[in-house]
Amino acid sequence: MSQSGTMSCCPGATNGSLGRSDGVAKMSPKDLFEQRKKYSNSNVIMHETSQYHVQHLATFIMDKSEAITSVDDAIRKLVQLSSKEKIWTQEMLLQVNDQSLRLLDIESQEELENFPLPTVQRSQTVLNQLRYPSVLLLVCQDSEQSKPDVHFFHCDEVEAELVHEDIESALADCRLGKKMRPQTLKGHQEKIRQRQSILPPPQGPAPIPFQHRGGDSPQAKNRVGPQVPLSEPGFRRRESQEEEPRALLAQKIEKETQILNCALDDIEWFVARLQKAAEAFKQLNQRKKGKKKGKKAPAEGVLTLRARPPSEGEFIDCFQKTKLAINLLAKLQKHIQNPSAAELVHFLFGPLDLIVNTCGGPDIARSVSCPLLSRDAVDFLRGHLVPKEMSLWESLGESWMRPRSEWPWEPQVPLYVPKFHSGWEPPMDVLQEAPWEVEGLASAPIEEVSPVSRQSIRNSQKHSPTSEPTPPGDALPPVSSPHTHRGYQPTPAMAKYVKILYDFTARNANELSVLKDEVLEVLEDGRQWWKLRSRSGQAGYVPCNILGEARPEDAGAPFEQAGQKYWGPASPTHKLPPSFPGNKDELMQHMDEVNDELIRKISNIRAQPQRHFRVERSQPVSQPLTYESGPDEVRAWLEAKAFSPRIVENLGILTGPQLFSLNKEELKKVCGEEGVRVYSQLTVQKAFLEKQQSGSELEELMNKFHSMNQRRGEDS
């Protein structure tokens, strides 16, 4: 079996025990100090023992079945793997003494391999033939091996020529009995000492800038392409002085896109590491089958290190970057293409499934609360995941499904600052202002202030001519700041209207109660909550998922709509809609005519044999669900309807109005196929409530007209 190196999908890995950066990132003074310290600790010559920091690239068996019969064949295969980016670097230490070559674990100093000098058949350098410019090649075969192994090492801190000269001098002394090595080491020691005062020369290719990746390059696969030009519709310059200039918005989008690319690179790098660890484990088992009992198999130490799984901290880091990528996909979904955000989310959940299974289940992922998901990210996942992905998402728990705006204030979730393998540091201003960090935070002080402070806030709003009511908790509109990205388009000059699809009952003074089929004017079209104004002049916030489009003519003749339930106070001082085609006197005359016609019809009804008017009411269910129901009543209603525990758990956190506002497709996305039954039961319950409401309204209307008729009769 051949032993190929693993793929480094991200050309830049941390200088940890597994993987190392192939590019050169900008270094801080602290990083420079640490690298010099590491250089001096890793590359030392003491007496007749020298030690070098190297990266193991690959080990091949020289075998015809693997198409490797010579060193040149092995080099050719390594070049081929490098061109396809299928080489995985493994950091270790190479020690040379007068008896053997030893490979040590860079962290534990544990011996991985020990090649006695008589088993080293060949030492050679491979320079500038692949992306690793300074490579050392060793051909080793012990007495029990039928075929030799070819090992490749990248000498990233001390040139391969120096290491090669050291090994050759040790081999010459061993074979010929000469004492060449002390003189060789003396020269090398002087060169290494000189290097300790300067930064080692950069090795490997420079990192490819994310924004310049070509669509056909290997690094560009599943990556975010160029953003949508800001000149396209939807990105016109906004007229408000508070909106971001185009240049600032474009710069912010570019930074967020780069953060997203770094996160995707690190996730892909981690998945490649898992896959190559599995391959190494398989090769290790195959080699162990042919070894003698009690003796290590050839290359067993290196393969054991490669097969070592990541630590729990590294799994957590990958889960955090996955959540960060989900947040950024939702935020940039209108700005990225080739591939789109909707396509990338599926590429993200495939590796996520693999990682969850590798770490033994969702327990580690469930513990990852930082970063939380934004409201847009949760909505984005609900709208794009397929059933299998939805099940995986639900298994990860509240820290993945509950948005930041609904998360408890205590314990506080810290700001998430990712550390990328490439060494690039994301801008702090972008992270600090991100929705998944600030959503809902503006409403916290109002809840925590004293009654006196709360009263002063209300008074200041009352006396301010431009003040507007604060929206509910997660309905806060974006903060008016030149550096705040707004997720909604500016309101056009022409008035905009929407039609209410479902009844909604306000839960506080900031929300607006609306009825189905009512047409209202849009004051603010935010992300989740829209500020609307009713015909009576009342303004408040309404969830956007119960709104539908309304034509201007629908709002132009509001008093002629047959299905309209809410008319507002019919007073002579009632403010007319601007689009009403007539003056106030004509309207009042028309209303008098309508009233007279109604009185005549009611008089005719009274002349007929009297009927006992009674509204039939259905028997109430054992667990009623109304528009005033809280989460506990919703949970009780779901349990009474014998829904599964998963459905009760997912929907039991909603209030009655929130549950009634969900349509069939939204319920199917959250509940799967059982969502159809939930929708059916909600439809029945909604009809029952409407029947109750319409009955009481009709009784009240009839009583009102009856009183009016009596007064008219008395006046005449």
Curated annotation (Swiss-Prot):
Function field: Stimulates guanine exchange activity of SOS1. May play a role in membrane ruffling and remodeling of the actin cytoskeleton. In the cochlea, is required for stereocilia maintenance in adult hair cells.
Database matches in SUPFAM superfamilies: PH domain-like (SSF50729), SH3-domain (SSF50044)
Disulfides per UniProt: none
Positions where Phosphoserine occurs in the chain: S240, S450, S571
Pfam families: EPS8_2nd, PTB, SAM_3, SH3_1
GO CC terms in record: cytoplasm; ruffle membrane; stereocilium bundle; stereocilium tip; vesicle
Protein name (Swiss-Prot/TrEMBL): Epidermal growth factor receptor kinase substrate 8-like protein 2
Chief location category: cytoplasm
Sequence ranges of Polar residues compositional bias: 452-467
InterPro entries named among the record's database cross-references: EPS8-like (IPR039801), EPS8_2nd (IPR055093), EPS8_PTB (IPR033928), Eps8_SH3 (IPR035462), PH-like_dom_sf (IPR011993), PTB (IPR013625), PTB/PI_dom (IPR006020), SAM/pointed_sf (IPR013761)
Species the sequence originates in: Pongo abelii (Sumatran orangutan)
Family to which the UniProt record says this protein belongs: Belongs to the EPS8 family.
PANTHER family: EPIDERMAL GROWTH FACTOR RECEPTOR KINASE SUBSTRATE 8-LIKE PROTEIN 2, EPIDERMAL GROWTH FACTOR RECEPTOR KINASE SUBSTRATE EPS8-RELATED PROTEIN
Domain PID: 46-202
GO annotation terms (biological process): positive regulation of ruffle assembly; regulation of Rho protein signal transduction; Rho protein signal transduction; sensory perception of sound
